[in-house]
Design a protein with these regions (language model features):
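Boundary/entry segment of secreted carbohydrate-active catalytic domains
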Residues: 26-67
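Acidic (Asp/Glu)-rich catalytic clusters
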Residues: 49-58, 76-89, 112-121
Length: 190
């Protein structure tokens, strides 16, 4: 019995790993655009990036993490923005949401909007909300929706929901699903 459970666990892990590395299409631009772009997301975790090489490798769009919570600006935000813009890449911004209430979500949207206010975004703004702590499904959806609505209100820009495949299929529901979905592909470094 233990061998069967162990084998089943391995099969499940391999299936999940395969799902996370499958290519997906992203609608980072408006629905009137049928063109598909190759893109990446970047943050301070990647260190110094040669965006000229990135462009030469066929990447057309770079989503840059600008902020997290209500007071953290990504350590490479300004540098990534300038270098990606200088390389002629299309740019989008994303914010890593840490809110645990609607009030906090709205404050995070205000912070995100203020951080990117002097920058030019070629793509929709993105909400990256993936660390839920003890929140239940209803709370997650309420907080995510509050963030996206407040962000749209403040910026007059469309928003996309950045999510992994598991969360997209099991957590997001209701009004949140009216927003376009950008499925993350963790572990893809080509």
């Amino acid at each position: 019995m233990k061998k069967i459970l162990k084998l089943l666990s391995i099969v499940i892990m391999l299936t999940v790993a395969t799902i996370y590395t499958m290519p997906t299409k992203v609608m980072a631009f408006g629905p009137s655009s049928d063109e598909i772009y190759n893109g990446i997301d970047v943050s301070g975790y990647q260190g110094n990036i040669d965006f000229g090489k990135v462009k030469k490798d066929g990447i057309q769009v770079v989503y840059i993490r600008s902020s997290e919570g209500t007071n953290y600006i990504d350590s490479k935000f300004e540098q990534n923005y300038k270098r990606a813009r200088d390389a002629g890449l299309k740019i989008g911004f994303y914010h890593y949401v840490t809110a645990r209430s609607v009030n906090q979500a709205e404050k995070e949207a205000q912070f995100f909007a203020s951080v990117i206010s002097e920058k030019v975004a070629d793509c929709r703004l993105a909400m990256d909300f993936e660390s839920f702590g003890n929140l239940n499904k209803r709370e997650i959806n309420t907080i995510g929706l509050a963030f996206m609505k407040k962000l749209e209100e403040l910026t007059i820009k469309e928003v996309v929901l950045y999510s992994n495949a598991y969360t997209a299929s099991r957590i997001w529901e209701g009004e949140v699903t009216k927003y376009p979905l950008w499925i993350a592909q963790y572990g893809v470094y080509e």
